[in-house]
Amino acid sequence: MAETRFDVVGIGNAIVDIIGRCDDDFLARFDAPKGHMRLVEEPTIRELYDAMGPAIEISGGSVANSMAGLSGLGGKAAFIGKVAKDTFGEIFAHDIRAAGVSFETAAADGGTPTARSLILVTPDGERTMNTFLGVSPEDGCLLY
């Protein structure tokens, strides 16, 4: 019997998590409900990103995070998700591979950028997420 290449293959949204600190006034200025997750469009994510302070950028998304966790526990994991040929796409691909997860999906050229989630952490530790799905849902119908 042939050896299996992977223990688990995950399919999901390839999202770059951008984690930074802010205060309640920052959230109010952008009408971001504290402690919630909201989907936003590209102009909003760009405005928030430009206004926020220093941040940590790392590959994320629930399925990608699960595959990284599996790999960290010694499993053989692969991830299928769409990124664009842009800086955030490069960050996602680098980080997921560095976590030991196989990621071979070709980056989309031109058009919609890579998905990202700005995770704003207030002094009390509350997280507020603003997520732009970007290119990740494009061509999703091919999977179903």
Residue ranges: model-predicted function:
Residues 58-65, 88, 110, 138-143:
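Short secondary-structure boundary/capping elements
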Residues 85, 89-97:
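Short, electropositive alpha-helical surface patch
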Residues 95-112:
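A glycine-rich helix N-cap at a beta->alpha junction
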Residues 27-28, 96-98, 122-124:
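Short, hinge-like loop/turn segments at secondary-structure boundaries
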